Amino acid sequence: MKVAVYPGTFDPITNGHLDIIRRAVSIFDRVVVGVAADNYKKTLFSLEERVELVRTVTRDIPGVTVKSFSGLLVDFARREEAVAIVRGLRAVSDFEYEFQMSIMNKKLASDLETVFLMTATEYSFLSSSIIRQAASLGGCIHGLVPPEVERVLLKRYGFL
């Protein structure tokens, strides 16, 4: 069984993330979405809330499991018996950072591959931070995040 991990902060998960997850599941037998504790970022949603949101919006995608993790990504990938790390690329600007990370991960775990998937064109501008900013100002985020996420965001910012 070929397992991949798809790590991220997912604060919140967007339709761009879901696009990558669906496509990764078509390549691998199982995809573990790793929600990072990420002690280096101030998140809008707690780790538990982010895990629950990701679980909610991926519940109907066969082959997907959702787990939280902290520490090195390669250690998480090894615990999950993954053969690959999946990363989404929105633009060339993402590639430089992701390329450096993939080299470091390869140094730490030479048997682990990194697979880059280009985000669908309609989501190439999308990021969690853009979604948070738009939602906080009352902007329309419909169609950019799953309905469950839209509801939670609007409620968090006092628009529901």
Curated annotation (Swiss-Prot):
The keyword Ion transport does not apply. GO terms for cellular component: cytoplasm. This is Phosphopantetheine adenylyltransferase. Its cofactor is Mg(2+). One of its GO terms (molecular function) is ATP binding. Reversibly transfers an adenylyl group from ATP to 4'-phosphopantetheine, yielding dephospho-CoA (dPCoA) and pyrophosphate. Pathway: Cofactor biosynthesis; coenzyme A biosynthesis; CoA from (R)-pantothenate: step 4/5. Its EC number is 2.7.7.3. InterPro entries: Cyt_trans-like, PPAT, Rossmann-like_a/b/a_fold. Keywords: ATP-binding, Coenzyme A biosynthesis, Cytoplasm, Magnesium, Nucleotide-binding, Nucleotidyltransferase, Transferase. It holds the Pfam family CTP_transf_like.
